[in-house]
Amino acid sequence: MKHIALIVLYFLSFSVQAERLKDIASVQGVRENQLFGYGLVIGLNGTGDSTAFTNQSFVSMLSRFGVTLPEGVNATSKNVAAVSLTATLPAFSKPGQKIDVTVSSIGNASALRGGTLLLSTLKGADGAVYAIAQGNLVVGGLGANGADGSRTTGNVPTVGRIPNGASVERIVPSSFNTGDTLTFNLNRPDFTTAKQVTDKINNLLGPGVATTLDATSIRVSAPRDSSQRVTYLSILENLDVEVAEERARIVVNSRTGTIIIGQHVKVSPAAITHGSLTVTIKEVPPVVGKDGTITGGQTIVSPREGIEIAPNSGHMFVFDPGASLDDIVRAVNQVGAAPGDVMAILEGLKQAGAINADLVVI
């Protein structure tokens, strides 16, 4: 029986978690942009398309070079493939700079190995052309056909890359050099971390320089001169900021069976039955003793928890006081439960309010 891979994460207190500001936040207006396009890959060794739109694109390409085919002539070529193009345009990219291009087959081509992308445009979401792509593909996948019609494929031979295959042709407008403020946006919104960033900047530059807008954004006064602004931002993004602890969270990967449990996950008394398994979490209030005061002492009652897991086979597992979610997962593993059983139990406990953590299934 496949066992669950369990990882328990223990986070340090936020007072000792110092991160650079550039690692936990980004500057508003400084961002990448996605580009897309359509093109033809030629030079394939019989592994191209046989689709109608590829033939139409091929005929259109020939006509641009002054080649006109007679009516009724089929322009099908197994050495040509229609492809989609994607690329990421970094912030502040300037005309003439190079970016990588990812090329993916659209039709029924079996492989793009050895192909060359013809000159194609890359557009942004606004429809404007921002880059021009062309070049030889680097394909990591491998495909092979046997004489009897058999076929084997390794990795993905229908997707390739062209390193530095596109030339930037247009600048994306940016608000970085406008106004007299900068705004930092945290990658993971958190009120405590936002306050820590604000306090750190104000302690360095003076009161009122930074203002917390919400759990994500911190607005900072900045010089208008572009060169001074770059120096100013360089200082700020290298500040060490104390990062708050994350919320209690359980992450479950339903495909691999991996469960990641944060440090602050608590389990309350509950009982759940799933298939052949019964999980019982109970709280027992034992008497601990006296506090040792002069007045004779006061009885202190401290709650403790225990877990029982009973499969139909008659086995029962009783745990020491101080039950944790880690104990539950390990116990269910011991009776040979499938990954789906553990995930169903966790989801049931979450719905019943017995787990005070976010349950994230990926």
From Swiss-Prot:
Localization, per the record, is: Periplasm; Bacterial flagellum basal body
Q: Name one GO molecular function term.
A: structural molecule activity
Transmembrane feature ranges: none
Instruction: Give any Pfam family that matches.
Output: FlgI
GO BP annotation list: bacterial-type flagellum-dependent cell motility
Q: Name one GO cellular component term.
A: bacterial-type flagellum basal body, distal rod, P ring
**Homology family:** Belongs to the FlgI family.
**What is this protein's function per UniProt?**
Assembles around the rod to form the L-ring and probably protects the motor/basal body from shearing forces during rotation.
What binding partners and quaternary form does the record give? The basal body constitutes a major portion of the flagellar organelle and consists of four rings (L,P,S, and M) mounted on a central rod.
The protein's name is Flagellar P-ring protein
Q: Which organism is it from?
A: Marinomonas sp. (strain MWYL1)
